[in-house]
């Protein structure tokens, strides 16, 4: 159930993430400046699931890094109404590639995420076990990364992120390396976890079907450099959702056509300009 703003805490009454006039630029190896994104205005409510799509090289990951506090920005980034200074410690970040330590079991890999918080070893193990149960790995806690499938490793990485109970989830194509069937299962798992916790989510993907099936809102970015937001689409599909079922709905296909109409020319422009070779 979404928070009722009339009775919500002061934090819940403010956007979980707010970007106003945000621009991110980098100095390239040859000394020239590269403006990755510009004029970004975006607000994400507590508990809202937002997906971001755009051509390769348009700065989708750069936006996530701005919200995480990993890059310097011009403009304003606010987290629950407060200006972001340094790392965003209210967010958890799930990358495309996991960072599991090969010498630790699944349980130990998840528990280690609590070490910086000074949590006792016993409590960390208990909480790690609970998180692994939530992601469907109750019978795999003692396995090492090389003994796990790609989907299982991704579940461990998700548990690593969730154990700190972040209020915001930043997800950078987290299911990209997985096969189609495993990717669909991970999407359904993520929706189930999100429905229970209702954290704010910003999810970057190249997969338009994935973007629609997961989100409350899909944000479309232009080709880079100096990419900007060109469209936003409210996803009015009923919840709870199962990805394989919702993709059969006529409304799903109507949304797909509408979003692709905004995205297609930008994808073609990116390929024509060579931006497809830049970092996302």
Please provide the spans of the model-predicted regions.
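Conserved signature/switch motifs of ABC ATPase nucleotide-binding domains
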Residues: 143-146, 164
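The feature captures the beta-strand-to-loop junction immediately N-terminal to the Walker
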Residues: 53-55
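Hydrophobic anchor residue at the start of the ABC signature
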Residues: 158
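Catalytic Walker B motif of ABC-type/P-loop ATPase nucleotide-binding domains
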Residues: 169-172
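Conserved ABC transporter NBD signature motif
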Residues: 75-86, 127
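Conserved ABC ATPase "signature" region
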Residues: 115, 122-140, 192
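Helix-to-loop junction immediately C-terminal to a conserved catalytic motif
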Residues: 68
């Amino acid at each position: 159930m979404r928070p009722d703003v009339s009775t919500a805490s002061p934090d819940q009454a403010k956007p979980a993430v707010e970007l106003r006039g945000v621009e991110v630029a980098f100095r390239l190896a040859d000394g020239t400046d590269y403006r990755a994104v510009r004029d970004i205005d975006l607000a994400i409510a507590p508990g809202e699931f937002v997906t971001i799509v755009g051509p390769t090289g348009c700065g989708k990951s750069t936006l996530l890094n701005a919200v995480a506090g990993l890059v310097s920005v011009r403009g304003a980034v606010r987290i629950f109404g407060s200006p972001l200074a340094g790392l965003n410690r209210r967010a958890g970040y799930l990358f495309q590639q996991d960072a599991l330590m090969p010498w630790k079991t699944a349980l130990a890999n998840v528990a280690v995420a609590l070490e910086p918080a000074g949590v006792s070893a016993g409590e960390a193990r208990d909480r790690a076990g609970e998180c692994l149960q939530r992601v469907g790995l109750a019978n795999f806690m003692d396995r090492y990364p090389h003994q796990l499938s790609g989907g299982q490793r991704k579940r461990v990485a998700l548990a690593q992120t969730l154990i700190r109970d972040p209020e915001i989830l930043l997800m950078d194509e987290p299911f990209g390396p997985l096969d189609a069937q495993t990717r669909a299962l991970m999407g359904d798992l993520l929706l189930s976890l999100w429905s229970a916790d209702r954290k704010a989510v910003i999810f970057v993907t190249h997969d338009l079907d994935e973007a629609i099936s997961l989100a409350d809102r899909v944000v479309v970015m232009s080709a880079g450099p100096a990419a900007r937001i060109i469209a936003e689409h409210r996803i009015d599909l009923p919840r709870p959702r199962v990805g394989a079922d919702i993709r059969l709905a006529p409304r799903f296909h109507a949304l797909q056509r509408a979003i692709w109409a905004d995205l297609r020319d930008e994808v073609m422009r990116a390929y024509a300009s060579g931006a497809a070779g830049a970092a996302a």
